[in-house]
C-alpha cells in the first residue's frame, strides 16, 4: 500500500433518487481502499469510509490523505480520526479541482464505464452493479501505467 491516498464525494441521480459515493483511492496503484455509498452526503458517510480503510493499515503509517475542502473534511471529528490514526491531512486549494484530479479521474472512469453504458432497472440494481464495478476495477481492470496489471495484482507483485 502506498503512503498517499485521496478521497472525494460524487453524486449519482437515478430514478429521482440521489446517491453519494465516497471512496478512498491509493495513489500508489489506483486501488479503491474503501468506500461508502449513501443516500445523504453526511459526516457518517466519510467516517464509516475512514473506519473501513483504517482496518487495513497499522497506526502511524506516515500516510497522507488528500481531499478537497468539502465541509465533511473540515469537520473536527473527521480531523480527529485522522490525527488519532497518525494520518496527515492534505486539502486542495480553494476552488481548484485539479488538486484532486486522481479522485476526479476515478469518478470519470466509473461514470463512463458503468453509469453511461448500462440501463438500470432500479436504484438497487445500480447499487449492486456499482459494488461489482469497484470489485472489477480493483481486481481485473488493467492499467498501462501498472504494466498491464490490475491495482490489486500490482500491489501483490510489489510485496
Describe every region a protein language model picked out:
Residues 1-159:
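Charged DNA-binding/catalytic regions of mobile-element recombinases
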Amino acid at each position: 500500500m502506498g503512503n498517499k491516498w485521496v478521497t472525494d464525494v460524487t453524486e449519482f441521480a437515478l430514478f429521482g433518487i440521489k446517491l453519494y459515493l465516497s471512496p478512498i483511492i491509493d495513489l500508489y496503484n489506483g486501488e479503491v481502499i474503501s468506500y461508502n455509498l449513501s443516500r445523504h452526503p453526511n459526516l457518517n458517510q466519510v467516517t464509516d469510509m475512514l473506519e473501513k480503510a483504517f482496518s487495513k493499515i497499522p497506526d502511524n503509517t506516515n500516510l497522507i490523505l488528500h481531499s478537497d475542502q468539502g465541509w465533511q473534511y473540515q469537520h473536527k471529528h473527521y480531523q480527529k480520526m485522522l490525527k488519532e490514526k497518525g494520518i496527515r491531512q492534505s486539502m486542495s486549494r480553494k476552488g481548484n479541482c485539479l488538486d484532486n484530479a486522481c479522485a476526479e479521474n476515478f469518478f470519470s472512469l466509473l461514470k463512463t464505464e458503468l453509469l453511461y453504458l448500462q440501463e438500470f432497472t432500479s436504484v438497487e440494481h445500480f447499487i449492486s452493479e456499482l459494488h461489482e464495478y469497484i470489485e472489477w476495477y480493483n481486481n481485473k481492470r488493467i492499467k498501462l501505467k501498472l504494466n498491464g496489471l490490475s491495482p490489486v495484482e500490482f500491489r501483490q507483485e510489489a510485496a
